[in-house]
Amino acid sequence: MKKIKPKDGNKTFCMAPWVHTFISPQMERRMCCASREPSMNFKQYIDSSKPANDELKLLPLKEHWNSDHMKSVRKRLMAGEEIPECATCNHKLLNAQVYRQHFNRFYRDGIDEAFEKTNDEGETSMQVASWDYRFSNLCSFSCRMCGPPLSSSWETENKKQGKFEPWMQNCLLYTSDAADE
């Protein structure tokens, strides 16, 4: 397996798949809040496609951490590939400091360890050090980069304007009562 460290010119490497896990209010597990991974359950705030199905499938961390998907992501990132899951950072879609920079700066002392503790199949023995678990979309802000699944304010506004997609009713598991007013 080809391995290129950031200090050797790898511009796409990100520490998130080695140290971080994210769960959305819709209980989708992903690499981080900005990753564009195939949805197991529902459309996410950053997705542009319909949900894969209507059945809720919760993915435990143990199954996710060294899943085929995560191993593939790690291998591709270590090889310096620009992967579609990381389009938000690759193309700076949020017009801000990209999450990749945050993870690589904050966990810079673990980069060599990530390369050492990842085998040729992409499996790692590193443990999660950062959890971003969002159990609700309750939020009084309406940030432009957000949307109804992560902001009850956006949810309320969309309902008022008749822009609330019917399928989203099933995926907003923990919405506020105010959103229904």
Description of each model-found segment:
Residues 31-38, 133-173:
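Canonical Radical SAM [4Fe-4S] cluster-binding loop centered on the CxxxCxxC motif
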Residues 174-179:
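Conserved small/polar residues in nucleotide/adenosyl-binding loops
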